[in-house]
Amino acid sequence: SDRVIWSEQGRLHLAYTATNEDVSANIFTIVNDVDGNSVGADHGIRVGDMVLVSSASLTLRGYCSAVSTNTATILPYAEATFDSAGFSDSAGAGAYRILVIGSEFEKGTDGRSAANSPKFKSHSNKHIIMKDYYEVSGSDTTQIGWIEVAGEEGQSGYLWYLKAEGDTRARFTDYLEMTMLEAETAVTNAGAIGGTDGGALQDGTQGLFQAITTRGHQTTGVTGVNAATDLAEFDAILAVFDQNGAIEENMMFVDRGTSLAIDDMLASMNSYGAGGTSYGVFDNSEDMALNLGFSGFRRGSYDFYKSDFKYLNDKGTRGALNDTVTNIRGVVIPAGVSSVYDEQLGRNMKRPFLHVRYRASQTDDRKMKTWITGSVGAATSGKDVMEVHYLSERCLVTQGANNFMLMN
């Protein structure tokens, strides 16, 4: 009950990396699926399958004539053996790719001898408990000032402690979001609290950035070198999306430098903007300033909606970090929902790709709890103070992380 557990279905089609066990006998050893997960004897290649087999320089079509544990015998259609086609026993592990494209059977033969079942990959994350606290003496709660105080949380009045309490609340709510972005799980024997339980209940929780780093994709492109280079690097991002879920609509949350680099890239492609004849908003009036700040655009078959990420720019948050090598410049997040199997509820359901899970019951909701103790107002203790407590228990669920992109 301390973890959120969900399962995501693997790819529909069967594709693997393989090593050529014996090219003269056309035997391949299956190593991993195309996402790098070890499969071995659990591969889905069956006798009768028609496949594509590729090396770095050649693709052949073949027929699977035999399967034994983690190996498959594949007979090429256009060659006597893969050896004669230029394949080598000395190629490294995973040097070849095998893709199942169909099947072929002789007249009057029996059907399949084995069935393929969907493969699911289970993921989990751990709730963490976050707390904060504000205290003011009973005497100070009675000090009325001459200037009205108004805070970001909507509090107002002539009591100065309202401002401090409101700031504490605002800071805590910011921490709730920042933790969901930045948190990571402690590894065994890590210096952080705990992390010594062999991974069963690691301390910490997997935030968005760690989820994308471990299960998603990363890019160092689109840095503003020049428009042509940025465009080529952006197209490389599209190629990665093509290989995965190909979610059409995506949100881009980026820092100022990356935002301007994307604007420059798009402006260079806009002949009107480059020629100075497009005046942007307000019915394209020539009396208005030229608008080169692009908030949404389409490239290939994808729509992107760009937004400046204040968290990455503000000197009070990540903008204060001096890391110029691995610092995060932005994140691309797919819009919409995905279908997953919730192992705790025992059913399939549609959830947003990115959402927060909280601990709650009919008697207690720990999404955001606030309570007051002390002797101010209704006394709950003998302490001459007013204590304001804040608590939340939550974790982030990043579904389909292979559709996310982190910009470093």
Give the location of each predicted region.
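Flexible, glycine/threonine- and acidic-rich loop/arm segments that mediate assembly and lattice contacts
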Residues: S1-G296, Y302, D308-R318, N322, ...
